[in-house]
């Protein structure tokens, strides 16, 4: 059960609340760097998320001091505007200004009504309302309903990415994330790309076919190998794909693809497409062509 879905009766009403978060302003961003970040555990003890987030934060969270807390403790602390919080939630897309909507807005394809599993980085707020909490660069992990095996291995890389985002916010409260990705794009040709074969469209699922479109260094790997590369801060890049996975494909489903650096979480490339029979939930041939323009 996600952090704000405490009572079943409120699930429908609260499902989209975090999608309405707004970006932190300059003062709130500055306060973040003075804050302690509270890592909020999930109430569901059967999820592997809790041991994973504790392990990965311990390895990769460098930007602020942190403390792991329960949801009960979060309810007490969330009204403190001097504290920051990292927690899991579900959220629908909205027209409000937050980091994911900024990225999604670069691409056409219609309105996205899907719900996403989000790793939130926010400041506390006196009202205690989650949709009032200033967003510091929350990042989607997966579409809601995706099994943990589709996102837990990427949490370390996403934590690194979040820290890169908030450092950019410190320089400029309204950074041009697309420009940042484009500036980093040239690094793709100098770093080995690691991809999981099943996350590629069927026509790319052989090394021969992939190499025809991608002449640079690459490797087909497992989820465990990507997690280990992030833990070791290896000089490779990897695909962070967000899509329906094994869920039933709807007309509104989108596939979002990030290329991230395992070493430091830098965003090197991002693309998004509406899922269809011709464009499956996977990295496409056209994605490789676009990356290498």
Name each model feature, range by range.
Residues 167-254:
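Flexible, glycine-rich surface segments
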Residues 86, 119-121, 193:
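Hydrophobic beta-strand residues in large extracellular and virion-surface proteins
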Residues 58-69, 209-221, 263-265:
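Structural alpha-beta junctions
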Residues 1-25:
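Bacterial Sec-dependent N-terminal signal peptides
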Residues 2, 75-78, 228-229:
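A general structural signal for short secondary-structure junctions and capping/turn motifs
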Residues 18-55, 61-64, 156-196, 200-201, ...:
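Sec-dependent signal peptide cleavage junction
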Residues 90-156, 227-293:
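Amphipathic beta-strand/beta-sheet edge segments enriched in Tyr/Trp
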Residues 20-117:
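Start-of-domain marker
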